[in-house]
Amino acid sequence: MAINQYGVNFNGRRIVHPGAYGSIDDSAMVVTSDGSSNIPIVIGTADSGKSGEVLWYTGVEDARNELGGGDLPQALEMMFSPSPEGGGGASLVGVIVANKTVPATATIGGVKFTAAEYGEGGNKIQVKLEDGSIPGSKKFTAYKWDTQDLDTFDNIGSVMSVAYTGTAKVAVIDVVVTDGVATKIETKVGEDAENLTVDLQLDLTNERYSTIEAVAQYLNSVSDYSASYVTSMSLELESSKLDAITGQDIKTKSYLTALKGDLEFRISQYADLVDVEVTGEIVNFDNTYLSGGEKGTTPASWSDYLDLIKKQYSDILVVLTDSEAIHAEALAHVQQMENRKQRQMLFVGGGKGEAPERAIERASLLNSSRAVLAYPGIYHSSYYSGSRELPAYFTAAMIAGRVAGVSQSTPVTFNKFNLVSLGRDMLAGDPEIDQLITSGVCTLEKVKNGAIRLVQGITTYIGSNNTLLREISVRRTADLVATSVEQTLEDTFVGKKGVSTTVSSVETVVSDTLAEKVRTEDIIGYGDIKVTFKNTMIYVDYEVAVVEPMNYILVRSHFVPDTGQFTTEEV
């Protein structure tokens, strides 16, 4: 039975797990988490790619190869390279395919083949099994006709050749298989077949002989024997996969085989197009297409995918949908993650052609310092050569990519973006832009030279003019600083002895951690560090002046008539 009085109460919740925990006080920020790692995770649809797990990419090319088309590869292109000059975005992005992709399969010739590519693309793969170049072996071919990708493996099954080079007139080899597992290799030699004696015995259950490579090396070390590999691809195959052999002549070169094991091993290790599972007796078959691959449908709820993110370290979440229900799920996830010591920010957007009033309505439903609503829809050169509008959730992805491409304390206000046009004419100075900004909508605008820029990097929080709650960069900096202090204290002190010098040691660690943030220009300064040690608890309070963006430059230009008080001479 759980005892609910264990642990401590802090910041409105009960803490049982030992560690360093924190809260952020923003009460002193009027007009005046965890720590960000600049790693976004994006949830959306794709033509291919395995659903139900986080896939990681460092560039858009690999993503397009694996995901095909759809929202995800399009968004990744914009997240990796949001700036007009190229680049300027995320360096690593996690992806979750929301639609339930299904790989194509085919079961034939005693083998089940499954496309490595999830989705309809696997239906374009054909497989074939025929006799190999070495008698008794097989040759496997997989071909994808639209990309002309080819996997081909010859001499499958023939893993090693063995020959007896001694003076005996007869030499044979046995491979003993017990319950489907090869357990022993034994050679016998003699003057005739009726008078053979055991010459060598290898216990394959001994780790010394656990692979084909190890067996071959041992045989080559023994006089009167020679062995060679058929292909280096099979060197690491377990010797326990060898097929049974009884009395096979080795006076001339003979082959040890492992047809089932070698087929599964080589294809699983080296094939790009398919995976295999041997289901019965392996026999040849002609070219056969895989079938049943589907893009799949997208569920109405993405809660299962959000649960996957709880096991990842990420500070930026993008959901590629205009569904307000999914936006609400994602925001609830982000709020929950703050209590799990993984502070995150959510970036979302609406659909195509939405009016400003609709965007304002969406922002009001979120109203959080951890949620960013982007507007309007956009035209990007990579999507139908810039001739078709992308929904505003792509705008959110692009802004998230830029946020991931700069330090946490760097504002993204007035950053320019690599776009052809906007889905709605938003010109600098339009009154509706002011209305959007004051309503918590992160808005793009077009300036005189045709460039497109972000008006202000803001969250959907609508309340006091508190930059920690309103500004993306200040919110992320607070997360970074708070988590850095908490993590450093946890790593340094939790589980250690509390002694007379503990308070001063904690003060020093906090001071050193904050001083580093001053050096990196994440904060302006810090002070008032207070540490209290009571029983098993250490209470730490401190104050930090965070770096805030310069949003307004107010210039008074005074023009007066010339009455002789000004000099006209060059200095």
From Swiss-Prot:
Keywords: Host cytoplasm, Viral contractile tail ejection system, Viral genome ejection through host cell envelope, Viral penetration into host cytoplasm, Viral tail protein, Viral tail sheath protein, Virion, Virus entry into host cell. InterPro entries: Phage_sheath_subtilisin, Tail_sheath_C. The keyword Hydrolase does not apply. GO terms for cellular component: host cell cytoplasm; virus tail; virus tail, sheath. The keyword Iron-sulfur does not apply. It comes from the Viruses. GO terms for biological process: symbiont genome ejection through host cell envelope, contractile tail mechanism. Transmembrane segments: none annotated. It is found in: Virion; Host cytoplasm. Its main location: virion. Pfam families: Phage_sheath_1, Phage_sheath_1C. Homomultimer. Polymerizes as an extended structure around the baseplate-tail tube complex. During ejection, the sheath shifts to a contracted form, thereby making the inner tail tube protrude through the host cell envelope. Belongs to the myoviridae tail sheath protein family. This is Tail sheath protein. It comes from Bacillus phage SP01.
